[in-house]
Every structure is written in structure tokens, then in C-alpha cells.
Amino acid sequence: MAKINQSVIAQILKAIGNANNVAQCGNCMTRLRLTLRDSTQVDKVALKQIPNVLGIIESDDQFQIVLGPGKAQAAAEIMNELLNSSTPTAQSKPSDTHLANIASANKKQLKEKQVSAVHKFLTKFATIFTPLIPGFIAVGLLLGFATLLEQITIQGVEHPNTILVEIIGYMKVFSKGMFSFLSILIGYNAQKAFGGSGINGAIIASLFVLSYNPDATSGFYSGISTFFGYSIDPRGNIIGVLIAAILGAWVERQVRKIIPDNLDMILTSAITLLIMGAIAFIFIMPLGSYLFSGMSWLFLHLNGNPFGTAILAGLFLLAVMFGVHQGFVPVYFALMEAQGFNSLFPILAMAGGGQVGAALALYVKAKKDSLLRTQIKGAIIPGLLGIGEPLIYGVTLPRIKPFITACLGGAAGGFFIGLIAYLGLPVGLNTVFGPSGLVALPLMTSNNGIFVGMAVYAAGLVVAYISGFVLTLIFGSKKIEVLKADVQSQKE
């Protein structure tokens, strides 16, 4: 697949109505997220034919172009450079067609319902957590390899090699560093995402990191142990931080409205912090604690129910398609706090296994030298490594039935992981977020050690592969080998 460069982005801009049609450009891990002024200007057929474009997703407030991991950020950076350097063209007289488009857009905006508002809220989580994901993956890999090395070379050894001990300790220290101060990073991103100043969010989040016990032997003592008679208990973890940062952004905007412009820099942040500190100590910390505990309890019990895990794994790709899968991230934090590992992630990762199995079934059924086989050859290796977009948007989703059987294959893998947990052996990721597919193997762990976690996860993938393959072979591979678009591509 071609590398993302200025030429590719120029083609994308042309297909979406040129630079003047782009109001805002951002990205998540796999998608270019655009806010367009007029979505009717998009040439979807031309857009889908551009190299690297795996698919498009339309929502009320965003036009998303699926590019895959490692490409979306580069694409957003190049596009923003082009947008900043482009000169706005003179606005011509509004035509009847243009006025009709404006009317249509206004009508669409007026029809937005609560579902749309919830979707917008959840998509902001991509802005909060996406910049942190490379760090999660990095510390997870280092911790996984360190634990693996520790169990092979040190555990049970009376006099372990000093150099190995130092190496293992060094590889583990990054995980401790990140998770010790992760709340501050999340507070910064959250307040910024919801329209406030990132630094205020970081300062508010730091209140959840500080210690309020003068006799504590660890942590950073804050200098106070009570707040006007209220005992301070910095619980609630990430849920409390998110609530505080989101509310803090709203408070900051309200304060800014009443502060004169010449005093904005001096007073707005100070007043915001004073208000939010009091609210955090009295209300958010206790409330966040209850919400965090409730969420942990719910998903711990759901993760141990095979039918519940089957539903989660089977529906996860739909959440990915609609861009609301980042809403699971606070749950990941809750499970890390409660269990010491993320037991939901391997369940959801089974969805990708079902896609791989379905694609292999289509490959078997497809004619030799067909375009479908060529598409699968290019997408199957990334799929095995946890990059599912090429398979989803290039192979299964356009043909509908294989996508459904792939989801059912993922559900079978989720059922297996849930059944093993129900029998007393839950497994999970050793970090909040990480890669899926085979790449996630070294990051798996359990209460019985890393090897057991890796074995259960690998077995779950095999179940998902086989189930997706068999279900697609029987129910999802009839009369779907060649799409009209494929025929056109072959003629060209």
C-alpha cells in the first residue's frame, strides 16, 4: 500500500470538495476525522479509489476516512499543513443549488436527536485517549517482555543474574511511571477536548494524584488533610478525573464570559481552579468512587458470563464502525484497578479473529486469480496482526453476509474467553490499551501467570478463526465473490 504523502492527501482534498470545504481536520488511531462545510460536495466514488483509503464513515458531525494504523496521524498533519498554506478562494454569489444545500444542512442539524448528542460525546474520547495509545502499547510490550524474561530466567532461581535483574527492572519502570501520572495526561486532554484549557485540566487531575495523609510513606503529600472539615479521599480514579475535567471545561467557559478581556489571562484560570478544587473534594471524588466501583463490578461479572462476553465480542465491530469504541476506555481503567489487568480487551479482540476466519473462507471459495483473492492476500497479514480495517472495509463489510458471519465468529471467540473466566481463569491485557491479534500475545497475563494468559488468548483466537471460517463457508460465501466495483476494477 502506498505511503501517505502530499500527493495522496491532495487527491483526498480534491475528492471531498477541496480545502475550502474542510472546516476542521483531526484524527484517531486509524481514521482521518473531518468536519466538512458541505458534505454534498464529496465524490465518494473517487475517494474510495484513492490509494490507502480503506473506507468512509459518515456521521452527523464528522466525515471519517479510514486509512489504518500509523497512517491517520501522518495524513492529518499533512492535510493541516495544506489547509494552513491554502488561500481561501473568493466567495461567489450563492446559487440556488448552494442555498438548497445550506437549507438541507440546517434541516439536518435541526433533526439531530439525543442519539447524535451521545455519539458526539463518545467521539470526544478519541481526542482524549488516541494520543496516549502509543504509550500504552509501548509500556505494555516492555512489561510483557520483562515479565516473560523474569518467569523464564529468574523465578525460582536462588542467585539470579544481576544484569538480568537490572534489565527487567529497567523495562518495568516505564509502566510504573506512566500509570503513576496518567491521570494528569488524561485531565489535560479531556479539558482541552471539551473546550477548556489543557493545563487547567492537568492541575485539576493532579488533585487525584496527591496524597492527603501526612503519615503516608508513599506519594506526594499535598500539605492538607481536610477541606474545611471535609475529609479528602482522592478516589474515583479515571472516572473522577474525566468528570472533573469535563465540568472544569464548562466552568472555565462560563467564567471567561464574565471576565474582562484584559483580565482573562490573570483571573479565568485562577477562578476556575478554585471552583473546581472545591467541587472535586466535596462531590466528584466520592461520586467518582461509587461510579468506578459500580462499573468495575458490572464488567467483572459480565466478563465472567460466557453469553455476555459473546454479545460484547459479536457487537464490537459495530461500535468500531460508528466510532464509539473509545467509550470502552474508562472501563479498561476500571478493570485495571480492580483486577490488575484489562480482562475486557481480549474479549473484544476476538472480533478481529472472526474477520480473519471469514476472509480465509472467502479466499477458499473465490476463483483462482480473482480480484477477491488479491484483496484478501493484501489484507490477511495485517488482520492477523490486529489491523482489521483492510479486511472490514475491503473484504467483508461490502459483501454484508461475510461481515455478519465474521461477527458471529468473533462472538464464538468471546464466548470461549468468557467460559474460561467463568471456570475461574480470567485473562487480560497487562496495560490499559494495546494491539490486538497475534501481536497482543506477549501482553497477555492472568492470576496464574503470563504463560496461562497467553495460552487462553491464543486458544480464543483459534476458536474465533475456525468459527468465522466455518460460518462464512456455510452461510456467508454464496453469490458474493464479485462485487460490481470489482468487475469495474478488473475491466480497467
Swiss-Prot record:
The chain crosses the membrane at residues 125-145, 167-187, 193-213, 227-247, 265-285, 311-331, 344-364, 378-398, 403-423, 450-470. The active site is at 28 (phosphocysteine intermediate). Coiled coil: none annotated. One of its GO terms (biological process) is phosphoenolpyruvate-dependent sugar phosphotransferase system. It is a multi-pass membrane protein. One of its GO terms (molecular function) is kinase activity. Residues 123-487 form the PTS EIIC type-1 domain. Gene3D superfamilies: Glucose permease domain IIB. It catalyses: N-acetyl-beta-D-muramate(out) + N(pros)-phospho-L-histidyl-[protein] = N-acetyl-beta-D-muramate 6-phosphate(in) + L-histidyl-[protein]. InterPro entries: Glu_permease_IIB, PTrfase_EIIB_Cys, PTS_EIIC, PTS_EIIC_1, PTS_IIB_1, PTS_Sugar-Specific_Components. Its EC number is 2.7.1.192. It is found in: Cell inner membrane. GO terms for cellular component: plasma membrane. Its main location: membrane. The phosphoenolpyruvate-dependent sugar phosphotransferase system (sugar PTS), a major carbohydrate active transport system, catalyzes the phosphorylation of incoming sugar substrates concomitantly with their translocation across the cell membrane. This system is involved in N-acetylmuramic acid (MurNAc) transport, yielding cytoplasmic MurNAc-6-P. Is also able to take up anhydro-N-acetylmuramic acid (anhMurNAc), but cannot phosphorylate the carbon 6, probably because of the 1,6-anhydro ring. The EIIB domain is phosphorylated by phospho-EIIA on a cysteinyl or histidyl residue, depending on the transported sugar. Then, it transfers the phosphoryl group to the sugar substrate concomitantly with the sugar uptake processed by the EIIC domain. The EIIC domain forms the PTS system translocation channel and contains the specific substrate-binding site. This is PTS system N-acetylmuramic acid-specific EIIBC component. It comes from Photorhabdus laumondii subsp. laumondii (strain DSM 15139 / CIP 105565 / TT01) (Photorhabdus luminescens subsp. laumondii).
